[in-house]
Amino acid sequence: INVLKNTDGLAYLSFISDHGTAIYDDGKSLYGGNTKGNYNIAHFFWFNDLYHKQHPELIQKLSINKDKKITSECFVDTSLELSFIESKIKKGCSLLNDKFIEKQRLVKNGKVYDFDQDL
């Protein structure tokens, strides 16, 4: 982040984890187990001062959706929009959409589970 702070021009950093980790969540410590802790993933954005100054509306839109249930598929669409890249491959899952609609979150561990109902 310190490198990006000193970058001329717009800069942002986005991170998404490929998996979560259950460390005594619900009294369990399981690697690869079928628990919410193993499926909850870290996802964050950081913006430099110039990005905040020139595009506060985009950061506000992210803030509006910060507590919504999302999946990792939202990462690509959101990153394309934050980078001002036009693409025909968007899936309609950008966190910059102020009318963002939560989708059913499914996980697979031998069989398909509804994250919010079954785990």
Spans of features found by a protein language model:
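Catalytic domains that recognize anionic headgroups
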Residues: I1-L119
